[in-house]
Design a protein with these regions (language model features):
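Basic nucleic-acid-binding interfaces
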Residues: 1-24, 28-69
Length: 69
């Protein structure tokens, strides 16, 4: 079972892989990379549900190993 990550951990991984903050609406922040991929991260949240983390991994195009799974 993958470990649960907080939104700060997810944001750190995204920024390390070239994503930058674009905008925020309510509690959801939008991050975008140079290739145009967009990932939406609910913020602030101590622990994200596993399904939400998997969705962010898919949106970003990164591998689960990049997030420490």
């Amino acid at each position: 079972m993958p470990r649960r990550l907080g939104s700060k951990d997810v944001i750190r991984v995204l920024e390390e892989h070239g994503f930058s903050f674009v905008t925020q609406r309510g509690s959801h922040a939008k991050y975008k990379n140079a290739a145009g991929r967009i990932a939406i991260v609910p913020h602030p949240k101590k622990e994200l549900p596993i399904g939400t983390t998997r969705s962010i991994v898919r949106q970003s195009g990164l591998t689960p190993q990049d997030f420490g799974f």
